[in-house]
């Protein structure tokens, strides 16, 4: 076995920071799959990524020439030779197709018989020829939305590819990938005058990059260095940094030669700009780390840490430049706040008349009026809310969209409204709801923390869904430009997690009527929206690891209360030893299905001849008595426990009682007993999906 180190580095123009990690992981995983498919052995693979390079280093790669053996199977011996041992036509034709004489064929015995075979030995394609093909294939497989073409090529990738390095130890693999010839030099840091770094051996990577210009090619190493340096610098001003994984990932993806530097801003900004807006400006807009006081208050300090992409002797100038940019951003925020505060939040309401919500769905002012009516109609689902506060939150919900702050910082919609509402002495619950109406804004995001926030968020999303479905702007498998899937899932998460007993059918019908559409069939649109919600529910439970059978058994019942659905799914999933109940349900279903002639709906005691059927009726009555209140309270776990208690009398009934009695009335009476039990099951789920 000949072991060597292989290196491939794809040099590109600046890659998008938000997908850098995803790109290299896809590149790595697909390469591992290709090695496995081609049965190529190796010790391990290291992967590297910076804004301008993607690289893989394969350690102890087996490069020895191997021979692949293929067996071409011919006819069975009994068909290949006649009784006298002479070859048949089938054998001759097979040998001809293999381009051999029959005397070159071998025999192979298997469990199924004996066959003639031909062994074909082929040399495996050399690594030098195979790997360039694999690399180009994988790069084409990286399916991301925003790919581009460059120069005269029709090939597509996320960013133009400018350099390819392919080394097998010290040997350059001469080939092309995406029409770019391979070589043995890496591109320097973007700020370096010396363009090229020559690499002698694949094993030198990534040390050669760090030695030449402190480039840290390993993503995780770079991230840890940034985190360590930021914490170290914060201590110099008696501060700490809070963990912000999104910011850390973004900054790591933006630099390849990181250096953390400390800068400051005026303390006046802390006193005037609300804390969350200040943090948003520093972290989200400027991609810097905020510093907090190292005490229980965790107040923000007038400093920030930024990550430079270069080691420089001119750090003072770099710091000064970043301070000027930060001052400009914070100064803008202060100016916009001053301008916005000249009006009360509620005084922005009339200006919403000039802002369109969406074509054929009116203005934001009209949406506000719809929210007011809708939220009032669903206030009955919770008793802990002040109705006036609920309506007030709807009225003020969109007012901050007109402000200069939201115009400049659109990501802060809702948050700005909350601060202005608090400054205007609105109730705290109203202010928080204004902020929380947009939650959850992405998968796994936090949910509204207050009852008013929950209902406002649900109302806002239901209004959008109803309107978009009514005008035909529904999601497709490829596109969902209005985030309707996310909105529906957000509604379901709030309802289920916060245990709000909302009936989707009712609030969708109310929402559609509030719109007052002309030439719209509300019934059809409502059914489409419900179907859409059910598909999202199925996705929700599948993602959480619930059994597909259990999900289908409940969703097939055409229920429209997500909380009720959740209780049923959890009851069936949690109950131990439910298999015996499922078997009973199956047996009853099969018997009832094969007997269609049920005329009467009443059970007649006088027709009962056997003790077992009388006992079963008695147990059914006890069950009805015990579960009447449980069904009202939707305590399905307790109901299933009670159903399990029917198991023994049902078994006795099946063992001792002949259901298909010759007397029609007796037969019908016995079937009615089973139908009663069948209805108990159907009041929880369709158990036919479980067996």
From Swiss-Prot:
Coiled coil: none annotated. Its main location: cytoplasm. It catalyses: tRNA(Gly) + glycine + ATP = glycyl-tRNA(Gly) + AMP + diphosphate. The keyword S-adenosyl-L-methionine does not apply. GO terms for molecular function: arginine-tRNA ligase activity; ATP binding; glycine-tRNA ligase activity. Belongs to the class-II aminoacyl-tRNA synthetase family. This is Glycine--tRNA ligase beta subunit.
